[in-house]
Design a protein with these regions (language model features):
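Phosphate/pyrophosphate-binding catalytic cores of soluble transferases and nucleic-acid-acting enzymes
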Residues: 1-253
Length: 253
């Protein structure tokens, strides 16, 4: 309905198999913005989203170091064998700012941030430019918020709506791509974990509620609970991150 009412960009624009970075987004978004202004548009709205990508467009990024494939493969092996929690805590120790701003439920993003930290000895977040790049347009930041209880209720209901609209079928159709970065995100990972349990690849034997971690995803209901919880946690981190930006004008819905 929203897509039909207003022209949107960067939706259905890339495939899950494409490697996409904040640096690429900065370049492509600036090119699009300049074109739209040249066509006569006076005001453009950027809606989101990932703090890292918004910073890339608003302030620009320094050049990030090239990937260390051996280190990345080692970290990806740890992610697969140990899960994301240990990597998260390592990132939290090495780079608290990145821990607070990236989607830490996305194992691929945690791996990339850790890769840069370990390879350079500097925080991943330090590569965000300390001096904002000049843009040829004015930027006004508007933040939308609502009471926490209402926000969480809307998140919970939205997840249920996503399932009713075919989330499980969508994820099932993407199973062969599950290791790609684009699918290491909240909403996909939990469903994949449920599929693994259903296929007998994961056992609940020996697991109790006191066992560290989330345990096996033994039902769709459990997957939905985890998606709701992880989305709430992500929203909380986003609010904390944006709350430190004094240039934002906040509106309560």
């Amino acid at each position: 309905e929203q897509l039909a009412a207003v022209q949107h960009y960067f939706i259905h624009s890339h495939t899950v198999t494409q490697l996409y970075t904040a640096g690429k987004y900065e370049l492509e978004a600036l090119e699009l913005i300049n074109r739209l202004f040249d066509e006569g548009h006076e005001t453009l709205v950027m809606a989101g989203g990932s703090g890292f990508y918004i910073d890339a467009l608003v302030n620009g990024l320094d050049d990030f170091p090239s990937a260390d494939l051996q280190l990345r493969n080692d970290l990806m092996a740890r992610l697969k064998e140990e899960g994301v929690e240990g990597l998260r805590q390592e990132l939290r120790h090495l780079d608290p700012e990145s821990y607070a701003t990236i989607d830490i439920a996305n194992g691929q993003r945690v791996v990339r941030a850790l890769e840069v930290c370990l390879m350079t000895g500097k925080p991943f977040s330090s590569f965000k430019t300390s001096q904002a790049k000049r843009r040829d347009f004015e930027i006004e930041k508007i933040g939308l918020t609502r009471p926490r209880e209402e926000l969480y209720d809307r998140i919970n209901r939205r997840v249920i709506h996503m399932v009713e609209e075919g989330l499980v079928e969508e994820v099932r159709g993407l199973t062969q791509y599950r290791d790609l970065a684009a699918l290491q995100t909240v909403g996909y990972k939990e469903i994949f974990d449920w599929f693994d349990y259903e296929a007998g690849l994961v056992s609940a034997e020996g697991w109790t509620p006191n066992t560290p971690g989330d345990g096996p995803v033994t039902s769709l209901d459990r997957a939905v609970e985890l998606i709701q919880r992880n989305t709430r946690h992500y929203a909380k981190r986003q609010l904390s991150y944006w709350g430190r930006d004094k240039s934002i004008r906040w509106l309560t819905l």
